[in-house]
Amino acid sequence: PFASIVAWVPFNEAWGQHDTNETLTYVMRFDPTRLVDGPSGWTDMGLGHMRDHHLYQGAEQLPEPESGRATVYGEFGGISLYIDGHSMFEKGWGYTKTESVEDFLTSYEELLTAIGGLIPEGLAGAIYTQTTDVESEINGLLTYDRKYKLQPEKVRLIHEKIL
């Protein structure tokens, strides 16, 4: 029931990325009790506790692992569903468009099943993008005004099958 910080992520997708290895070294020395993701997504410089990939289409094959670093998907998913009256704008954006709750649930289950199949191959973690819809992105499990898109019980059953 308590939030916690388990990893530091100084850079995401090269946004403001500079002096990468110096920054990662500083963070690892400053807080040796937590993992350091360096960086999440695009421009990896070979430092940090994990090699973080972003995946939005398919999950058939795990990227080549690196010795001494965990392989994770720091972002995956991107399944979009517009729910009338629960978005900031009439149109939103996502990688995979669905037209109904049923389509969203099917796409979500297929993607998580594929991700789960990569665990025995060495996938150490994956973070669904994203928990909630935001202004222009409708990829969330919850709408912009924090209503469920999918019944929590159905999501739990999918997760239990994989884990």
Residue ranges and their predicted role:
Residues P1-H159:
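Substrate-binding/catalytic cleft of secreted carbohydrate-active enzymes
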Residues K161-L163:
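Surface beta-strand/loop "capping" patches
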